[in-house]
Amino acid sequence: MIPGQYQIQPGDIELNDGRRTLSLAVANSGDRPIQVGSHFHFFETNDALTFDRAASRGMRLNIPAGTAVRFEPGQSREVELVDLAGLRKVYGFAGRVMGDLD
């Protein structure tokens, strides 16, 4: 094996199978790029991102772990969100929840 080499089994890998998803239109109303990582609680993203924030509570981007989506100033795009799993408790980020989601 070469350092940093990926060894991936053939075929498709299903991500977040069976979890509720939601598509949202998101726009960057700010003057700087905003990048959101795969496991960031989308509800608590930068306030310059405009979208239906209430609908995104308890959700994250439905993208592979360790990746991110970048929103350039003035850019709008459709994103897919997926429910957070596990204990469904959120602490940190922007401090808007600090506890149970349900």
UniProtKB/Swiss-Prot annotation:
Gene Ontology cellular component terms for the protein in this record: urease complex
A Pfam family annotated for this UniProt entry: Urease_beta
CDD domains: Urease_beta (cd00407)
E.C. numbers: 3.5.1.5
Alphabetical keyword list: Cytoplasm, Hydrolase
Keyword set includes Transport: no
SUPFAM superfamilies (UniProt xref): Urease, beta-subunit
Keyword flag Transmembrane: no
Cell location: Cytoplasm
Enzyme type, top EC level: hydrolase
Biological pathway: Nitrogen metabolism; urea degradation; CO(2) and NH(3) from urea (urease route): step 1/1
Swiss-Prot/TrEMBL GO biological process terms: urea catabolic process
Protein origin, superkingdom: Bacteria
Subunit composition and interactions: Heterotrimer of UreA (gamma), UreB (beta) and UreC (alpha) subunits. Three heterotrimers associate to form the active enzyme.
Family that this chain belongs to: Belongs to the urease beta subunit family.
NCBIfam families assigned to the protein according to its UniProt record, in alphabetical order: PRK13203.1, urease_beta
The protein, known as: Urease subunit beta
